[in-house]
Amino acid sequence: MNIKRITTEADLHEALKIRRGVFIEEQHVSEADEFDEFDTLQEQCQHILVYHENQPVGTGRARIVGHTAKLERICILKPYRKYGLGKIIVSGLEEIMKEKGLTSYKLHGQTQAAGFYQKLGYQISSQEFMEDGIPHVLMTKEISRNIT
């Protein structure tokens, strides 16, 4: 398993295919809600891929919103879940945003995944709300700047 920062249109296409499989086909999110103006290689939105045996099987993105990093679109193809890939994706996105000087993180986590994010240090910061027809909660995390 390895992780890669997306820097090419071909890699971005792979990430979008994974998101289509998970969010649109599996969870029935509309295409209009899933894909947006941040699905590009622009600097303020970073995308990553996680690989299993040289095949892309998971993805996520993080973008800068004010002084906060917002982690989004974190997903893994169904056969590859429960192998620790989600933790790799979240850690990778956090590291990219930390390199940009951000220490405040937030995400809209599906309620059924809140326990996963809590194990990674996120706290539930809202009541449950609906997003794209799926129950979510706002989750936040603050990290320290390790100045060396």
From Swiss-Prot:
Transmembrane segments: none annotated. PROSITE patterns: GNAT (PS51186). GO terms for molecular function: N-acetyltransferase activity. InterPro entries: Acyl_CoA_acyltransferase, GNAT_dom, GNPNAT1-like. Gene3D superfamilies: 3.40.630.30. Residues 1-144 form the N-acetyltransferase domain. This is Uncharacterized protein YyaT. It comes from Bacillus subtilis (strain 168).
